[in-house]
A protein has these predicted regions:
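Conserved N-terminal beta1-alpha1 strand-loop-helix module at the mouth
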Residues: 3-77, 83-84
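Hydrophobic faces of well-ordered beta-strands that scaffold small-molecule active sites
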Residues: 23-27, 57-59, 88-90, 118-119, ...
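Active-site beta-loop-alpha junctions enriched in small/polar residues
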Residues: 28-32, 62-64, 93-97, 122, ...
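A general structural detector for well-ordered alpha-helical segments in enzyme core domains, enriched
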Residues: 42-46, 74-78, 104, 108, ...
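Catalytic PLP-binding core of fold-type I/II PLP enzymes
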Residues: 76-96
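Conserved anion-binding
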Residues: 98-110, 116-176
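Conserved small/polar residues in nucleotide/adenosyl-binding loops
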Residues: 177-183
């Protein structure tokens, strides 16, 4: 699918070099705010004030979805106005069957125009393929997360003493050596 002038990893590396920082600024507006219409100005202020230091911005789509259609409109209106040299990682943590993932990938990379997305690989690596068809885009796979519940699955020990998150890390390059266009990273 469409080419781009600078890949996600190149854009991120340039930004880290320019700022001397690996700061990723989360954009997580609370849906319970009394004045929904104050959220766009608040987000723009956060972006403006942190842009000189930010290596990336990371809006969490769940917060926008929780506000309904208006929340998605806020996100869709914000993204084109963000600094073009600062990569945007959409924190979506999606993991679904391929056909559904195809539409998530389209929505995030084509409609919203984000540079990268977070995904859950636990339904199998074939569920990632729709995202991997976008040249130069980034994909962050959840491998071992910081929440206490990560012990329930991600940190479980497998036969042979390895942990689930290690399996995720090992399988990514092996599974996708034929796909060199996007960048796959682990979180």
């Amino acid at each position: 699918m469409g080419g781009m002038s600078q890949s996600f990893t190149d854009k991120l590396a340039a930004r880290i070099k320019e700022t001397g920082s690996a700061l990723c600024v989360g954009l997580d507006p609370r849906p319970g705010m009394d004045d929904l219409e104050a959220i766009p100005a608040l987000l723009r202020k956060v972006v403006e004030e942190t842009a000189p230091y930010a290596a990336a911005f990371k809006p969490n789509i769940a917060y926008f979805e929780a506000m309904g259609l208006r929340g998605l409109e806020i996100l869709e209106d914000l993204l084109p106005d963000m600094p073009k040299d600062v990569p945007v990682v959409l924190d979506a943590k999606r993991g679904d069957i391929g056909e559904t993932q195809k539409y998530y990938a389209h929505a995030y990379f084509e409609r919203l125009g984000v540079d990268a997305v977070t995904l859950s690989p636990f339904m199998g690596y074939d569920t990632l393929e729709p995202f991997l068809n976008y040249e130069g885009k980034g994909v962050y796979l959840l491998a071992v997360t910081s929440n206490p519940g990560s012990a329930d699955v991600e940190r479980q020990e497998l036969a042979g003493g390895r942990r689930v998150f290690e399996l995720v890390g090992d399988m990514v390059p092996v599974s996708y050596t034929h796909l060199t266009l996007p960048t796959i990273l682990l979180v």
